[in-house]
């Protein structure tokens, strides 16, 4: 499964480390990653690939990590993301 993971919140130390450590624990490989900092607002977008077939559990674990870090983490199946953003 491939997924698009977005992270948004106030910038602070440990966001990238926390999110990527959780992805590693979930055995997800980061295919692409981009992050931006604008006026104290942190955003990161990743395409990840995992063999984890339980998408709901994958989403829930990243959501819990987001709450712990004080950021919003949104996970969407890559195929759905692409279909929604097709011109």
From Swiss-Prot:
Alphabetized InterPro entries for the sequence: ACT-like_dom_sf, ACT_dom, UPF0237/GcvR_regulator, UPF0237_ACT
Transmembrane segments: none
CDD domains per the UniProt record, alphabetical: ACT_1ZPV (cd04872)
SUPFAM superfamilies (UniProt xref): ACT-like
The ACT domain, residue ranges: 4-76
Domain of life, per lineage: Bacteria
Family in the record: Belongs to the UPF0237 family.
HAMAP family per the UniProt record, alphabetical: UPF0237 (MF_01054)
Matching PANTHER family: UPF0237 PROTEIN MJ1558 (PTHR34875:SF6)
NCBIfam families: PRK00194.1
Protein's recorded name: UPF0237 protein YjhC
Gene designation per UniProt: yjhC
């Amino acid at each position: 499964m491939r997924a698009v993971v977005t992270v948004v919140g106030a910038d602070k130390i440990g966001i990238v480390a926390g999110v990527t450590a959780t992805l590693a624990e979930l055995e997800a490989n980061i295919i692409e990653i981009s992050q931006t900092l604008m006026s104290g607002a942190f955003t990161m977008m990743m395409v990840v690939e995992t063999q984890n077939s339980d998408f709901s559990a994958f989403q829930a674990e990243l959501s819990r990590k987001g709450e712990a870090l004080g950021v919003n983490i949104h996970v969407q199946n890559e195929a759905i993301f692409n279909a929604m953003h097709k011109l």
